[in-house]
Amino acid sequence: MNGASRMTLPRLAVAAVAALALALSLTACENVPTYKQPSLIRVIDASYAAPAVNVTVEGTLIAGNIAQGTITAYGAVPATTAALVNITQATGGLLAQISDVPLAAGSQSSVFLTDNPAAPNGFALGVLQDQQVAAATGHSAYRFLNQAVNTGPVDVYMIPGGTTVANAIPLITALPVGGTPTYINIISETVTLVITPTGVIKPSYTSPPTSLTGGEVRTVLILDSQLTSNPPVVVFTANDVN
């Protein structure tokens, strides 16, 4: 063996240590757990009939001691194809349950508690899929949930500054109670939300002017006003995105 290919004992030791360190490093990398993106979920309580409730998803408490007119912030739960959602009285006792709820990684959903038209003292439970991507540049997305059982169908206006409701075109006409919710995109500007019983201008709910700059995604819950006839409804707005 010539001198160019000969390795001394010290060099062999260094090479062996380096090889061992590399092997341990690779093993450590292989044992790092893979990150799994969670699913985001919240609760929208629109039920007059239901008592104060707690809501758990896969055993995780998402909302505690909430009642009608509440829209909670999103909470994170592990993604799954078959989540179990439990609604219990805040004082104890199971009220309702849904199983096999798909909660995809990175998705946003809402547990939706409503009154049951077929049972005046009962309530219904469902899960809505929420938009998780910002509205297009220069646009805003709105979804309206009509649960104003006594008022019935409503007309929804998004009125630009300087325009009156008499000169405005409804964004939605005759939105039914419990109708299938979809997002509607509008051009972003300063608008006033006005909601009236279908076919009339008064009585109405009128919001303060809202400045929309683009990208907003909102869910608007419409409920009966319990103490007044004018406005006939009350409104709760949640930020889905931005």
Language model segments and positions:
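Bacterial N-terminal signal peptides that target proteins for export
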Residues: 2-16
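N-terminal non-cleavable signal-anchor helices
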Residues: 15-18, 78
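Alpha-helical transmembrane segments
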Residues: 19-23
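C-terminal motif of bacterial Sec signal peptides marking the signal peptidase cleavage site
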Residues: 24-28
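Intrinsically disordered, low-complexity polar regions and short flexible loop motifs
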Residues: 29-242
